[in-house]
C-alpha cells in the first residue's frame, strides 16, 4: 500500500547544497577507543542497502521493489520482505546495545536514494525513524557513518557523463530532506554502486570532479579496478593504506581523490561473518611517508541479501566487538572518514599516499604518447581494443563476469536518448535561471531519467526488468515531448 504519492526530493537546492558541502564538516563527537599512536590495526565495514523503484504499483505507479515484495509474497524470495525491512533498521538496535556493553562499535551505511524514497513512500516510520536516529543522534555520530552514492544505483561507466552529477546531487537532496543539512555535512565518503569505477579517461575525470565539487573527500574502490602508475596491481600492504586516485582526461587535465581499498570480490560472507575484524587482528602498523600508520581492512557487502546477512551477521557483529573490547590488543573498529581524519590530525595528508589510477590507464597513456588529445585517446583505445579483445574502457567492478554494456543496447540507447532529450530541454533554461530545478516538470523528468539509469534493469537480464526500463523510458520521453 502506497501511503504517499509525493515525488522524491531530488532537486531544487543545488547551489545551496554545493555551498554547504564546501564547509568543513564537524568531526565525530566521540573519540576512538585508542589514540592513533596506540592503534596497531583497524577495520572499516560498510553495509550496502538498495531496493529499486519499479513501475509496478496500481495503474503502473512507481513503487519500491520492497513494496512489490510485500504485495506478492509468493514470488521468488519475496517472502523475505519483512526480514529485509528489519535489516534496514536493525543497526539502530545493535549499535546502542553494544555501546551499553562497553564496546566501541563502528559501521558505515550506504543506502540508495531509491530505498530512502521507497521507505518514505511506504510510510515505514520504523525504518526512517531508525535511520534518523543513526544519522542525527549526537552519540550515534561517532559510531555510524553514512556514505553517499548515486540516487538510483546507477553504474558510473555506462551513465551519461552529464548525469553523474545529477545522480550525486539527487542523493544529497534526498538525504538532507530526510535527515537535515547537518547530517549531510558529515557525509564525506562515497560508495559507487557495484564498486564500479569508470576507466575511460573522460568518464573517470568527470566522476571524480563531480565528487570533489560535491564535497566528497574519499571514495571506496575495489582493489582490482585500480592499478599503480606502472600498471602493476596494488600490493597487499597498499590495499591496507589510503591511496590517492588520480584521474587524467583526454586533454591531459588531472584531478585526484583519496581512495580506500575494498579487497577481494563480491562475497557478503566477508562482512556477514566479520572477516575484516579477524583479518585486522593479525596485522601490524605499516610504513606511510616518514612514519607508520595502522593497517586498515576495508570491506563492504549487501546489508540484507542472503541468509548470512539476514541471520548470521548480528551475532557475528556482536562477537567481533566484544572480542575487541576484551582483548583487542591495539586493534579497533574505525569508520573511513574517522581514520583519515586521525591521519590528518597527525600531520599525514594525501601527499604521502601511494598514487594509483583506474585499471588500463598505463597501457592507454603509453599508447597515446606525450601529447594527449581527445582524438589521440580515442584512436589509442580503438587500437588497443583491436589488438587485445580483453582490453576494455567500460570500467571495472566486483562483478567482472557481468557486462553492464554488452547486450543491453535496448536499455542503453533509450537511456542515452532520454538523457540527451532532458539536457537539450533543460540545460539552456537552467543556464538562464538555476531555480528551474524547483519546477515540477523538471523534477518529474529528472526522476524518470535517474530511474532509467538504475543498474537493476540491466543486472537481471532481458525480460521483466528491461520491460520496466522500457516503460520508464516511454514515460520520460512523453514528459519531454
What are these regions (language model features)?
Residues 171-172, 179-235, 305-328:
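Catalytic domains of cell-wall/extracellular-matrix polysaccharide-remodeling enzymes
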Residues 2-86, 114, 236-267, 275-279, ...:
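Active-site and substrate-binding clefts of carbohydrate-active enzymes
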Residues 78-95, 123-134, 164-169, 202-207, ...:
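Well-ordered, non-membrane alpha-helical segments in soluble/globular domains
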Residues 164-194, 250, 284-299:
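CE4/NodB-like, metal-dependent polysaccharide N-deacetylase domain
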Amino acid at each position: 500500500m502506497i501511503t504517499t504519492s509525493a515525488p522524491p526530493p531530488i532537486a531544487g537546492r543545488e547551489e545551496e547544497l554545493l555551498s554547504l558541502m564546501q564547509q568543513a564538516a564537524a568531526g565525530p563527537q566521540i573519540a576512538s577507543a585508542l589514540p592513533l599512536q596506540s592503534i596497531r590495526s583497524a577495520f572499516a565495514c560498510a553495509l550496502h542497502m538498495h531496493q529499486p523503484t519499479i513501475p509496478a504499483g496500481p495503474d503502473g505507479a512507481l513503487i519500491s521493489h520492497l513494496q512489490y515484495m510485500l504485495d506478492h509474497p509468493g514470488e521468488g524470495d519475496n517472502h523475505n520482505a519483512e526480514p529485509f525491512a528489519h535489516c534496514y533498521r536493525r543497526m539502530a538496535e545493535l549499535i546502542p546495545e553494544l555501546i551499553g556493553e562497553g564496546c566501541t562499535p563502528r559501521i558505515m551505511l550506504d543506502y540508495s536514494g531509491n530505498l530512502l524514497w521507497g521507505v518514505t513512500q511506504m510510510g515505514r516510520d520504523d525504518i526512517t525513524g531508525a535511520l534518523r536516529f543513526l544519522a542525527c543522534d549526537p552519540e550515534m555520530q561517532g559510531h555510524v557513518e553514512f556514505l553517499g552514492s548515486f540516487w538510483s544505483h546507477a553504474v558510473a561507466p555506462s551513465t551519461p557523463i552529464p548525469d553523474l552529477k545529477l545522480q550525486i546531487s539527487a542523493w544529497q537532496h534526498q538525504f538532507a530532506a530526510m535527515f537535515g543539512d547537518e547530517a549531510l555535512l558529515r557525509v564525506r565518503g562515497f560508495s559507487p554502486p557495484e564498486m564500479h569505477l569508470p576507466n575511460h579517461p573522460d568518464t573517470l575525470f568527470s566522476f571524480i570532479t563531480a565528487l570533489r565539487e560535491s564535497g566528497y573527500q574519499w571514495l571506496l574502490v575495489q582493489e582490482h579496478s585500480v592499478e599503480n602508475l606502472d600498471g602493476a596491481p596494488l600490493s597487499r600492504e597498499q590495499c591496507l593504506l589510503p591511496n590517492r586516485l588520480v584521474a587524467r582526461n583526454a586533454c591531459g587535465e588531472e584531478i585526484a581523490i583519496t581512495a580506500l581499498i575494498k579487497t577481494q570480490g563480491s562475497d557478503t560472507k566477508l562482512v556477514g561473518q566479520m572477516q575484516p575484524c579477524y583479518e585486522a587482528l593479525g596485522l601490524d602498523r605499516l610504513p606511510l611517508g616518514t612514519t607508520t600508520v595502522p593497517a586498515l581492512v576495508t570491506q563492504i557487502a549487501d546489508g540484507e541479501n542472503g541468509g548470512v546477512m539476514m541471520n548470521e551477521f548480528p551475532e557475528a557483529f556482536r562477537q567481533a566487538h566484544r572480542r575487541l573490547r576484551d582483548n583487542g590488543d591495539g586493534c579497533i573498529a574505525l569508520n573511513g572518514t574517522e581514520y583519515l581524519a586521525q591521519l590528518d590530525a597527525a600531520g599525514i595528508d594525501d601527499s604521502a599516499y601511494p598514487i594509483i589510477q583506474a585499471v588500463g590507464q598505463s597501457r592507454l597513456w603509453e599508447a597515446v604518447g606525450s601529447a594527449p588529445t581527445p582524438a589521440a585517446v580515442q584512436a589509442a583505445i580503438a587500437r588497443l581494443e583491436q589488438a587485445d579483445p580483453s582490453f576494455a574502457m567500460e570500467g571495472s567492478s566486483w562483478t567482472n563476469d557481468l557486462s553492464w554494456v554488452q547486450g543491453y543496447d535496448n536499455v542503453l540507447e533509450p537511456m542515452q536518448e532520454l538523457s540527451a532529450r532532458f539536457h537539450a530541454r533543460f540545460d539552456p533554461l537552467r543556464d538562464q535561471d538555476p531555480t528551474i530545478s524547483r519546477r515540477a516538470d523538471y523534477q518529474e523528468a529528472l526522476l524518470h531519467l535517474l530511474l532509467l539509469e538504475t543498474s537493476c534493469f540491466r543486472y537481471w537480464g532481458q525480460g521483466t526488468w528491461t520491460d520496466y526500463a522500457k516503460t520508464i523510458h516511454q514515460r520520460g520521453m512523453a514528459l519531454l515531448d
